[in-house]
Swiss-Prot record:
This protein's name: Transcriptional regulatory protein GAT1
Cleaved signal peptide residues: none
Biological processes annotated in GO: negative regulation of transcription by RNA polymerase II; positive regulation of transcription by RNA polymerase II
Organism: Saccharomyces cerevisiae (strain ATCC 204508 / S288c)
Main localization (coarse): nucleus
Zinc finger (GATA-type): 310-334
Amino acid sequence: MHVFFPLLFRPSPVLFIACAYIYIDIYIHCTRCTVVNITMSTNRVPNLDPDLNLNKEIWDLYSSAQKILPDSNRILNLSWRLHNRTSFHRINRIMQHSNSIMDFSASPFASGVNAAGPGNNDLDDTDTDNQQFFLSDMNLNGSSVFENVFDDDDDDDDVETHSIVHSDLLNDMDSASQRASHNASGFPNFLDTSCSSSFDDHFIFTNNLPFLNNNSINNNHSHNSSHNNNSPSIANNTNANTNTNTSASTNTNSPLLRRNPSPSIVKPGSRRNSSVRKKKPALKKIKSSTSVQSSATPPSNTSSNPDIKCSNCTTSTTPLWRKDPKGLPLCNACGLFLKLHGVTRPLSLKTDIIKKRQRSSTKINNNITPPPSSSLNPGAAGKKKNYTASVAASKRKNSLNIVAPLKSQDIPIPKIASPSIPQYLRSNTRHHLSSSVPIEAETFSSFRPDMNMTMNMNLHNASTSSFNNEAFWKPLDSAIDHHSGDTNPNSNMNTTPNGNLSLDWLNLNL
């Protein structure tokens, strides 16, 4: 109190600074003690005994300093890895015990012990005590042992070891069922205790693993019950084996086993699936081959079953049997008639001869020779296709009977162009045109012949037979001068006394 007394009555900055230094020294001393304790605890060599629970010690060591340490996540990951390493050491020890027990059970010494030793019921108490102890230890440590806190590089290795351990555990369960049948006649006490301890180690490991289902744990209890039951019958052994098989089949639902399943569980199913997948293309090939054979073989003219008769026409020869709406058999003709017309086929249309359809006319067959049909020739299909296409084209052309239109190249053109005849000179009767209509020379002199007009007139008024007539294309230059009119009265060539042109040379078939 004498240190704080001057502060209350005579405050001064010197005393205030001194008190501050004292408080700082006390704080540094306290923190130094905590750091020393931490360093001493870290300098201790950890005991890697697999029976010790190191994750609890590491957790207690770093839980207080987790918030102030920069690499707290890495330390947490390291703690989980150390714990997993110890758990795998424990698993290896369990597997060694189980293998030694299996070797002993297969030896002739074990059969002699089973034949001589009396029954022993001391396993019940040890099993129940060990189970209660391990269950209490599980409640303290927690069941979330294998969480996803591993590094990404080690995930595949961990999954592989889990699947291997799981398959080994299932094999150990089978050996435990065999061991139960041996215990029916009796084992020595030291062997029974070792068997129970190793079997209980299996029990705690299966409870701690999250990738094992509850079905496997229940099956493990059934193994314990068969282990404790001392009936000498062989039926218990078979029941235990069936229980292990059911546990092996139910454990395939776990996610880790889906990623990397054990070979003892998934191989039969995978073989079955592969065989089914291989059978599918084989079935497709069989179907395709049968379809090719059915298409290659022509349909028979008669039915395979002569006892069947048509319910309408009572015939027994038909290329195809059909059915009416009531389910009665119909021949091909009656069935098609009913399908197309909706009524039954009259008996007056019945014929005993099956007519074949004429797919091409006789003219086309005479003109075009079909190629030789050979099923062995690979190019026969292409030739047959070309043949049918040519037959169809020629048949279509003959049925339409189309006359191609006349082109300008097909029309005979005169060497000397002649003018077209005016409308008032045309007549429907054959006669000599005289001086009934006066025509001046200027009409023809100013007129220029147009080839298009000439062809149009000829096509419109004359038939095609008149094109070959010499009088139709008689030249007009002898009577008409296209350049200048002849007004000389002394020239009487093709003129009348009145001075009109005489058109007697026009012998047109108009």
